[in-house]
Amino acid sequence: MNYLNENIDSLNKKLASGELSADKLAKDTVANIKETDKKLNAWITVLDDAKPAENLDYSKSKLAGIPIAIKDNIITNGVKTTAASHMLYNYMPMYDATVISKLKKAGATFVGKTNMDEFAMGSSTEHSYYGATHNPWNLDKVPGGSSGGSAAAVAGGQVVAALGSDTGGSIRQPAAFNGIFGIKPTYGRVSRWGLIAFGSSLDQIGVMTKRVKDSAEVLNVIAGGDEHDSTVSVREVPDFTKFIGQDVKGLRVAVPKEYMDAVSGEMREVIQKQIDTLKDAGAIINEVSLPHTKYAVPDYYIIASSEASSNLQRYDGIRYGYRAKDTKNLLDVYVKSRSEGFGTEIKRRIMLGSFALSAGSYDRFFRQAAKVRTLICDDFDKIFAENDVIVGPTTTEPAFGIGEEVSDPIKMYNNDILTISANLAGIPAASVPAGLVDGMPVGLQIMAKRFDEGSIFKTADFIERTNKFYEKTPTGMED
């Protein structure tokens, strides 16, 4: 089953009418993944025996019988969950993450776990124990990261929807690089229980699909309260599909100078064209400033690395995960297991975080970073007092070549300069396809105030209806 021209509504109609059975859909999906993944390497685990739930009611749940991909840092009962790390190469969870339980209740079919940067730390899906994932638009390019496997699986027509996680842009940047829609909800909108932790104050599970409405359908299911996660909001979840097809007349759209100045040439023209489309439809365009954007990258890497160094202390070779052989004593077990189990990028982040949290550095680095984070939040609050959404480029460039930046951490980190601030502020943000630059997709980022994902869906759906990017086929998947 190839999903390049399918969406959740079209599949639901075929399933409900009997034109297609959920069993056949699952089998055909797995077969197509195995065939096309020879090009992409988007999957770590493919479930050969993937089966739909019994007694599916297609009239009550749009997700009934729909195959969905899961990023491999989201816990799945009885299905190997590795976070793309040698440290967890044999980890078999005994419970489901809350989002998985909710999707099962809705009747979704799970077909496997997607590739990613190890422990979600990366921007290219090259930092994976299972090898790099390839971009469906050009197999020599990266798919972005860390949710690159999920993005490539959707863009390559392997599935119609996938879950990802976003700590500093890990849903939006791959969505932009692969020409799909990806949304990071408000921090606290979706339960993080069962998400393998990277940066606990930044992490958020989100959705990646080819069509905007499909993400709304999935977010309807996974959003909402959870007794296992004290940070998740218990506020009522609106029906996000109600924002699809709405008019944007009168929508107040802020365009940050700092974001537009970060791009030039053809890329700026593509982004500006989408902004002009909103203006032509009656949206009110306001140029604004987010002055602390220039501090976002160093601020993020101090906070995220500090939280990561704490979260990753649990991987010691004792309770679970990789355990080194030929060790002499307990300390040797710790040192060798972590040295051999973690990849280079993980060790780099642990060292950075441990330094920032050390007694002699805490006040100079982590405490100062927390203050800068507050200033970034204040910037957004001021803008949203007079605007409904903020739009601009998702990334500063289209997808780069595999191997081009993997050995240059500073250059790799700067890929996140336009996405990081939304995580620091905890606001919802998404990327919707804007067009092509040199044959590769670029995305328009849309941000809104906390818990106003509806404005994002309204804006993104309008852009999608206008440019119809979903009609394009990734050139790397053409026979």
Swiss-Prot record:
HAMAP family: GatA. Belongs to the amidase family. GatA subfamily. SUPFAM superfamilies: Amidase signature (AS) enzymes. NCBIfam families: gatA (TIGR00132). Allows the formation of correctly charged Gln-tRNA(Gln) through the transamidation of misacylated Glu-tRNA(Gln) in organisms which lack glutaminyl-tRNA synthetase. The reaction takes place in the presence of glutamine and ATP through an activated gamma-phospho-Glu-tRNA(Gln). Heterotrimer of A, B and C subunits. Its EC number is 6.3.5.7. InterPro entries: Amidase, Amidase_CS, Amidase_dom, AS_sf, GatA. The keyword Membrane does not apply. This is Glutamyl-tRNA(Gln) amidotransferase subunit A. The gene is gatA. GO terms for molecular function: ATP binding; glutaminyl-tRNA synthase (glutamine-hydrolyzing) activity. It catalyses: L-glutamyl-tRNA(Gln) + L-glutamine + ATP + H2O = L-glutaminyl-tRNA(Gln) + L-glutamate + ADP + phosphate + H(+). The active site is at 71 (charge relay system), 146 (charge relay system), 170 (acyl-ester intermediate). It comes from the Bacteria. Pfam families: Amidase. GO terms for cellular component: glutamyl-tRNA(Gln) amidotransferase complex.
